[in-house]
Amino acid sequence: MKTSVLVTVLGLAVISVLCSASQDEEQDMYDELLSAVFEVNDELQSEARCGEKNDRCKTNQDCCSGFRCTKFRRCGRR
């Protein structure tokens, strides 16, 4: 009787630990997914803000990579 109670308690403890570990892994998966989505969103927004050829600019940072701000305040080829 004592042995079966001990085995039952140990079994419940093992199940509890396994369930807790799987919940942590699931939460980590959601956190990684959300951070990846926000990272892609930030990249798209920063790319959308840069100036293409003949877009108005004040500095070279206003133009996309491969372009520079010309003396006419337009993005042009380097």
UniProtKB/Swiss-Prot annotation:
GO molecular function terms listed in the Swiss-Prot or TrEMBL record: ion channel regulator activity; toxin activity
Entry keywords, A to Z: Disulfide bond, Ion channel impairing toxin, Knottin, Secreted, Signal, Toxin
One Gene Ontology cellular component annotation held by this UniProt entry: extracellular region
Cystine residue pairs: 50-64, 57-69, 63-75
Main location: secreted
UniProt tissue specificity: Expressed by the venom gland.
Subcellular localization: Secreted
Annotated propeptide span(s): 22-49
Segment forming the signal sequence: 1-21
Biological function: Probable ion channel inhibitor.
Family: Belongs to the neurotoxin 10 (Hwtx-1) family. 64 (Jztx-20) subfamily.
Domain comment (free text): The presence of a 'disulfide through disulfide knot' structurally defines this protein as a knottin.
Name of the protein in question: U23-theraphotoxin-Cg1a 1
Organism: Chilobrachys guangxiensis
